[in-house]
Regions:
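C-terminal transmembrane helix pair
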Residues: 114-115, 122-161, 167-197, 323-410
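Generic hydrophobic alpha-helical membrane-segment signal
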Residues: 2, 91, 98-100, 135-140, ...
Length: 410
C-alpha cells in the first residue's frame, strides 16, 4: 500500500514540477525528457532482468546444494545458544524455537524462499503461546526485529546487480555490507532487549555479542591502517576468498550428506530464469516511476535540498545522492532495489554513490512489509514497540553504512 502511494507520487509530483517549468520558465524540453525516460527506463529494466539470469542461476544452484546439505540446520544449531537467551519467555523445548532458528539461518544465507514460510510458521507457533491474540508478545517483537535488521552473510542479489551494471569488482561491497548489517542487527538486539528488560550482561550474550564486536573492531582497525588502494585490494580479495570458501563448504556439505550435488545445483539453477522474468514488471514499474521523477528535475531538487541542509551543518555531502535507497528500504524492497539500480545507472556502479546505494540495500530489510505480513498472518494489530525497534535498527544500519562507505570508498 505504501509503495502504491509512493509510485503515484512519483508521477504526480513530476507532472506538477514539469508544468511549473513549462509555464513559468519556458522549459519546452521537460515533457519530452520525461517521456523519453519512460522508454529508456523500460528498456533498461528489461535488459537488467535478463542479464541477471546467469548469475542468479549460479547462486540459486549453490544455495540449493547448501540447503540439501544441511547448512541451514548446522547454522541454526550454531545460533541456538544466543537465541535461547534472547527469547526467555519461550518454554524450553517448544517447537517454535526450531522454526525461529531455521528462519534466521535461512535469512543469513539469503534463502528468502525458505525463510518466509519458516517465519510464518514461527509466528503461528508464537501466537499459540500468546495470551492476548491481538497484541504482539516480546518474543514476536524480538523475532521480527532480527528479521527487519537484515542480517545476511551472502548478499547475492546485490552482487548480481552490480555485475550486470558493469562493476569492475561486483564483490567489493561484500565486506562493507557485512559490517553495516552487523551494526544494524546489534542495534536492534540491544534496543529490543532494553525495551524487554532482557539481561544483556548474561555470560552467553556478552561472549557472543562481545566476540562479534571484537572481530568487527579488528576488521575496521585493520582496514584503517591501510591506504585506500591497498584497502580496496585486500577487501576485494578477502570477499572473493570467503565466497569461494562458501561454495566449497556447501559442496562438501552436500557430499557429506550423500546429496547428488550436480542434480541439486541444476534443480536450484532452474529457478534462475523464472526469478529473473518474475522481477521484470516490478523493475519496469519502479524504474519508470523514478525515471520520470528524475527527468522532471524533482529528484535533483530533493537531493540538492538535503545537500544544502547537510552542507549548512558543515558535513560532507557525497552520501546524499544515495539516500533515496536508504529512505525507500524500510517501505519497499522492490522500490529500494529500483533506487539502487537508478543510482548505479546515473552515477556508475563503481562510483561512491553507486556503492553506498548497494550497502544501504544490504544493511537493512523492508521493516514495514515484514511487520505487515508477519503480524497480519496471525491477526496481531497491536504491535507495541516493534515499529520503534525496527526503525531504530534501520537508522543504525544507515549511519553505519555511510561511515563504512567513507572508510572503504571515500
Amino acid at each position: 500500500m505504501v509503495l502504491n502511494y509512493i509510485w503515484i507520487g512519483f508521477f504526480l509530483i513530476a507532472f506538477v514540477i514539469a508544468m511549473v517549468k513549462l509555464l513559468f520558465f519556458g522549459d519546452f524540453d521537460v515533457f519530452p525528457a520525461m517521456m523519453d525516460s519512460t522508454f529508456a527506463s523500460s528498456k533498461t529494466a528489461f535488459e537488467i532482468s535478463l542479464g541477471l539470469t546467469g548469475v542468479l542461476s549460479l547462486w540459486l544452484g549453490i544455495m540449493k546444494i547448501g540447503e540439501k546439505g544441511g547448512v541451514v540446520n548446522a547454522l541454526a544449531k550454531l545460533l541456538s545458544p544466543i537465541f535461547v537467551k534472547l527469547f526467555p519467555e519461550i518454554p524450553k523445548g517448544h517447537p517454535v524455537t526450531g522454526s525461529i532458528f531455521m528462519n534466521i539461518a535461512a535469512n543469513m544465507l539469503g534463502l528468502d524462499n525458505a525463510a518466509t514460510p519458516l517465519g510464518l510458521k514461527a509466528m503461528e507457533q508464537l501466537q499459540e503461546l500468546n495470551p492476548k491474540k491481538d497484541t504482539a508478545t516480546n518474543p514476536m517483537i524480538m523475532f521480527l526485529v532480527l528479521n527487519t535488521s537484515g542480517l545476511t552473510l551472502i548478499p547475492i542479489s546485490i552482487m548480481v546487480y552490480r555485475a550486470q551494471m558493469g562493476a569492475a569488482q561486483p564483490t567489493d561491497i561484500f565486506i562493507p555490507i557485512l559490517l553495516a548489517t552487523f551494526f544494524s542487527t546489534l542495534a536492534g538486539v540491544i534496543i529490543t532487549s532494553l525495551y524487554q528488560k532482557i539481561n544483556l550482561l548474561n555470560r552467553t550474550i556478552l561472549l557472543t555479542l562481545g566476540g562479534a564486536a571484537l572481530v568487527v573492531a579488528a576488521i575496521i582497525w585493520g582496514f584503517g591502517q591501510m591506504d585506500s588502494l591497498l584497502m580496496n585490494k585486500v577487501s576485494t580479495s578477502a570477499a572473493n576468498i570467503i565466497l569461494m570458501l562458501i561454495i566449497i563448504a556447501f559442496i562438501l556439505a552436500g557430499v557429506r550428506k550423500k546429496v547428488n550435488v550436480y542434480d541439486a545445483f541444476i534443480e536450484g539453477a532452474k529457478d534462475g530464469f523464472t526469478t529473473a522474468v518474475r522481477i521484470i514488471p516490478y523493475l519496469v514499474a519502479i524504474l519508470v516511476g523514478i525515471g520520470v521523477f528524475r527527468a522532471s528535475g524533482a529528484m535533483d531538487m530533493l537531493i540538492n535540498g538535503i545537500k544544502y541542509g547537510v552542507g549548512a551543518c558543515g558535513g560532507n555531502t557525497d552520501f546524499v545522492a544515495a539516500l533515496p535507497t536508504a529512505l525507500m528500504k524500510p517501505l519497499s524492497g522492490s522500490g529500494a532495489r529500483g533506487m539502487m539500480v537508478d543510482a548505479m545507472t546515473t552515477y556508475g556502479a563503481d562510483s561512491f554513490v553507486g556503492r553506498l546505494s548497494c550497502i544501504f540495500q544490504g544493511s537493512t530489510d523492508t521493516t514495514f512489509y515484514i511487520l505487515a505480513v508477519y503480524f497480519g498472518s496471525v491477526g496481531v494489530v497491536k504491535m507495541r514497540h516493534a515499529v520503534t525497534c525496527g526503525l531504530l535498527a534501520d537508522l543504525a544500519g544507515i549511519i553505519a553504512a555511510i561511515a563504512i562507505a567513507y572508510m572503504f570508498f571515500g
